[in-house]
UniProtKB/Swiss-Prot annotation:
Pfam families per UniProt: GcpE (PF04551)
Gene3D superfamilies: Dihydropteroate synthase-like (3.20.20.20), Sulfite Reductase Hemoprotein, domain 1 (3.30.413.10)
Gene Ontology biological-process entries: isopentenyl diphosphate biosynthetic process, methylerythritol 4-phosphate pathway; terpenoid biosynthetic process
Known catalytic reactions: (2E)-4-hydroxy-3-methylbut-2-enyl diphosphate + oxidized [flavodoxin] + H2O + 2 H(+) = 2-C-methyl-D-erythritol 2,4-cyclic diphosphate + reduced [flavodoxin]
GO molecular function, one term: 4-hydroxy-3-methylbut-2-en-1-yl diphosphate synthase activity (ferredoxin)
Keywords associated with the record: 4Fe-4S, Iron, Iron-sulfur, Isoprene biosynthesis, Metal-binding, Oxidoreductase
EC number(s) given by UniProt: 1.17.7.3
Residues annotated as binding [4Fe-4S] cluster: 272, 275, 307, 314
Descriptive protein name: 4-hydroxy-3-methylbut-2-en-1-yl diphosphate synthase (flavodoxin)
Pathway involvement of the protein, from the record: Isoprenoid biosynthesis; isopentenyl diphosphate biosynthesis via DXP pathway; isopentenyl diphosphate from 1-deoxy-D-xylulose 5-phosphate: step 5/6
Entry similarity comment: Belongs to the IspG family.
Free-text remark on how the cofactor is bound: Binds 1 [4Fe-4S] cluster.
Keyword hit for rRNA processing: no
């Protein structure tokens, strides 16, 4: 039994699928993905952005393939990246076949707009022959005409009906290596649709709030929407959609999972907003430490608190902690225990040193 049951999240057990060497669903870690915003035909720019996204901690990267030149470019792109590539396909079934044959490990499609049964059969055959999974991507902005006419507007029931229709299309062709998403730019609609879908299927679910907005608004909307679902135990892979640098999507995605203890990777920093009581410059210190500790992948906790009101209590619950003290004499905590005083000007170097040392110790135990 958990010592802190109020923190427990019981994930729904879903089927397991493979996207390259990444397993999605079941007890596997919730994966984080992003999407390139380069022209896929600009092969060098796309390779660079994929590698930047991967370096930030992405498990998967999606690439748009709007034309033949883009889907064929995957053959060269996949030679120079080590993260599984998902090809984003709309309307033209040949693009999906080309992507599967040229290195994509997953196809993001909506079977309902790919074409007739013969075309869908050809796409699924290419996917099977190339060990390529599929994501059924239902979106409130592109629902089937008859479903929209039935429900009058996008609603949770409409998204779920579209998903179930597309699930049947794949199952009827004996294809089961797929995940599903039911996205909307509306948080309430998205949450309700995913909750309904989770009740009627055990295929893995890809979570996202589509067209969420810029960095601030998009991060907030995604955190509320995805956070609510993840706390319900729903979701096997996530994407934060931002009108910004795709690398930032990975930062936010990993922070959401880290905050919910669903995937601990890297240093989790607990810090105060600072006030007149701070004994050192908390905000500047945190910004510098976030940058200097970005290379640490070992999960551990660090508290940076500017005064003694909450500092000792927070430090007692983290691996490493700094609590502000009078006259620049701040207290360093190691494993929740007071260690020694540290001058304000030495905080950065000392904390970095202690974090790296602690990470090395933990790595040896793994």
């Amino acid at each position: 039994m958990s010592l802190r049951p109020f923190r427990d999240i019981h994930r729904k057990k879903t089927k397991v699928i493979n996207v390259g060497d990444v397993k999605i669903g079941g007890d596997n870690p919730i994966s984080v993905q992003s999407m390139t915003n380069t022209l896929t035909t600009d092969i060098q720019a796309t390779i660079k952005q994929i590698n930047d996204i991967h370096e930030e901690g992405a498990d998967l990267v999606r690439v748009s393939c709007p034309d033949e030149e883009s889907s064929l470019a995957l053959k060269e792109i996949t030679k120079h990246v080590s993260v599984p590539i998902i090809a984003d396909i709309h309307f033209h079934y040949k693009r999906a076949i080309e992507a599967a044959e040229n290195g994509a490990k997953c196809l993001r499609i909506n079977p309902g707009n790919i074409g007739d049964k013969l075309k869908i059969h050809d796409v699924l055959s290419a996917a099977k022959n190339n060990d390529c999974s599929i994501r059924i991507g239902v979106n409130a902005g592109s629902l089937e005409k008859d479903i929209l006419e039935k429900y009058k507007e996008p609603c949770p029931e409409a998204l779920v009906e579209s998903a179930q229709r597309n699930i049947k299309i794949l199952e009827d062709q004996d294809f089961f290596n797929f995940k599903i998403s039911v996205k909307s730019s509306d948080i309430f609609l998205s949450i309700a649709a995913y909750r309904q879908l989770s009740k009627v299927t055990d295929y893995p679910l890809h979570l996202g709030i589509t067209e969420a907005g810029g960095f601030v608004s998009g991060s907030v909307k995604s955190s509320i929407g995805l956070g609510s679902l993840l706390m319900d135990g729903i979701g096997d892979t996530i994407r934060i959609s931002l009108s910004d640098d795709p690398v930032k999507e990975i930062k936010i995605g990993n922070e959401i999972l880290k905050s919910l203890n669903l995937r601990n990777r890297g240093v989790k920093i607990i810090s105060c907003p600072s006030c007149a009581r701070q004994a050192f410059q908390v905000i500047d210190t945190v910004k510098i430490l976030e940058d200097k500790l970005a290379h640490i992948k070992t999960p551990l906790t660090l508290s940076i608190i500017g005064c003694v009101v909450n500092g000792p209590g927070e430090a007692a619950m983290t691996d490493i902690g700094i609590t502000g003290g009078g006259k620049g004499n701040n207290m360093l905590y190691l494993s929740g225990i007071q260690s020694e005083k540290v001058l304000s000007e030495d905080i950065i170097s000392r904390v970095v040193s202690e974090v790296e040392k602690k990470a090395a110790e933990l790595d040896k135990k793994l």
